[in-house]
């Protein structure tokens, strides 16, 4: 009984430390932001001009660029991450092929972002430049689209890691019952697996979106290094 009380207190202290850490981060950001807030107000958030020489600091282009690249990357990554999750977690579950694929996914997740940035700059950007030429667009190669492609590759492993585990947790009895009524594998996935695992799949998507929002290095290397709001 005493050990159980101690265990609960230790868990409570651990939880309180996490909350306290988040609170301290927020307070630190707020305190260090006060000089900017006093000088610029909230104009910093909606200003469009970034010119340190004349003291103009508008973060709106960076905010919009972050949101655009993250949303586009998420749209690109969802079909691939969901397909691979079903492949690993359902079709080829616990097979050698799925284990090999899971290993590659884990390796992809730990590759430094600067490596993705260099690959995007020297390999993907020329491909995008060729595509822009064919579409009669300015052939820069570095753009929102290029950054979104890099981001989508970077966040796919995070969505897969969560989604495949949730898909594996779908009770076999539910699937066997559906098969016994003559349902096809596609129907089982559509009617049983995805509805059951939707919360976990959404959590994986949310995790990957957070990863995309927080990425800086790779995006900076391929987005074009321009502080203006894109018009196309």
Predicted segments, located by residue:
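N-terminal signal-anchor/first transmembrane alpha helix
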Residues: 1-27
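Membrane-interfacial helix termini and adjacent extracytoplasmic/periplasmic loops
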Residues: 38-57, 116-153, 223-226
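Residue-level signal for discrete positions within transmembrane alpha-helices
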Residues: 62, 66, 103-110, 155, ...
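Transmembrane alpha-helices
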Residues: 107, 115, 162-163, 179, ...
């Amino acid at each position: 009984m005493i050990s159980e009380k101690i265990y609960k207190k230790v868990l409570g202290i651990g939880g309180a430390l996490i909350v306290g850490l988040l609170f301290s981060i927020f307070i630190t950001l707020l305190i260090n932001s006060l000089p900017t807030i006093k000088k610029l107000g909230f104009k910093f958030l909606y200003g469009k001009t970034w010119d340190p020489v004349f003291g103009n600091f508008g973060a709106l282009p960076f905010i919009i660029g972050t949101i655009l690249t993250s949303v586009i990357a998420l749209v690109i990554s969802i079909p691939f991450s969901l397909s691979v999750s079903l492949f690993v977690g359902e079709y080829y579950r616990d097979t050698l092929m799925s284990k090999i694929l899971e290993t590659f996914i884990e390796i992809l997740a730990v590759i430094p972002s600067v490596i993705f940035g260099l690959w995007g700059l020297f390999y993907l950007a020329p491909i995008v430049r060729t595509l822009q030429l064919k579409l009669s667009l300015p052939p820069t190669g570095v753009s929102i689209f290029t950054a979104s492609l890099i981001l989508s590759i970077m966040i796919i492993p995070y969505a897969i890691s969560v989604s495949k585990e949730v898909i594996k947790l779908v009770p076999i009895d539910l699937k066997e019952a559906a098969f016994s009524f003559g349902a096809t594998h596609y129907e089982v996935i559509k009617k049983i697996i995805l509805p059951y695992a939707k919360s976990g799949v959404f959590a994986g998507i949310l995790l990957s979106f957070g990863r995309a929002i927080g990425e800086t290095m790779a995006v900076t290397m391929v987005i074009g290094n321009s502080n203006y709001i894109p018009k196309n």
